[in-house]
Amino acid sequence: MAAPAPAFTAPFPPSAAPVVVDPPASSVPAFLRPLEAAYLRFEAARDRLGLADPGKYEDLGREVKLTHLTNYTFDGARADLSKTLSQVPAFQVTHSFAAGGAAGPMGGVNPGTYNFGAVYATSKTFMQGMVDNEGSVTGRFNYGWSPRDTTKMSVQLAASAAAPSMFSLEHDRVGKDYTASLKAYNPSPADLTGSYIGAYLQSLTPHFAVGVEALYQRQGEVEDCSLGYIAKWHDVKKDEAGAALKDSWIATAQVMAQGMWQATYWKKLAPSIDAGVDLLCVPALSPRDRKAVATAGVKYDFRTATFRGQVDSTGKVSALLEQRLSPAFAFTVAGEIDHIKNTSKFGVGVAIDSASEEAMAAAMNAGPQAPPPI
């Protein structure tokens, strides 16, 4: 009797047999499908390059601004008293006092100013408001629709007619290898007056990006339109915490739509030392109106202090030291000498930050939170 033929089984049990799924039908009309196929091939080629987004237009030269003390220096006496009322969501109020500076009326000594501010922030919303002793009000509102899309609004209401009020609306889009932004200052839908700025940056290589800026202004019957161009070179390596490592650098060059030229260079010299250089040129037909200012600065980060030093081509030498004596108390000293005008400025300030017991308890029990859309 012949042996029975061997039995063969399928390579997969019936429940695990592979299922062939037809690709989804394209919703594009037939006559546009060649364009769709070309676009998909183009997107696949972009993905293979592995390019990262070049950063937002408004952040060009941000590292240099953080290194220099132009946005931090002051003169006279200043005190900031802050209290954190909540950690999740973040809610903080601040009382700011200033006196003795050179920003007083008619160029005299400032007799004293007071500002009250409040900040509220979540992972999707950021709100900030401030009012001073003269009644001027400023406010900001940011909303993050997604990690890649953010809408921003700001308003400034001046107490006196001499200072103009302002309203701005902005939207930022961060793509895989590009960034785009649209901004409008004092827009009027009725007659389309106002200032409108559009910017686009595109990464071409992992270390190089180019962009364009368009400016359109309309005030009454006067219209103006101009273009600007941007280039950015960078080689930034970061640690696990997101901080830049030694020898990281960023260089930018910009021909602004307003006609000015600007170039910046920033480098991480050491884990606690940053250096930055900025060159700003204002071309003009008349040699008397042509201006150029070069600024070089350095920042040292110590365990409980930060020192900034700066010198520029106009003869100004300035320095700022912020000493944090405790987590809730900081002492700041700022000074500037203008060798050309033979003038000097000096400032001293304190900052006190406190938190309620409820806020501290909530912070200890809360998990990691996403940063607000600033």
What is each stretch, according to the model?
Residues Y229-W233, A294-V298, A319, K341-I374:
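Outer-membrane beta-barrel "beta-signal"
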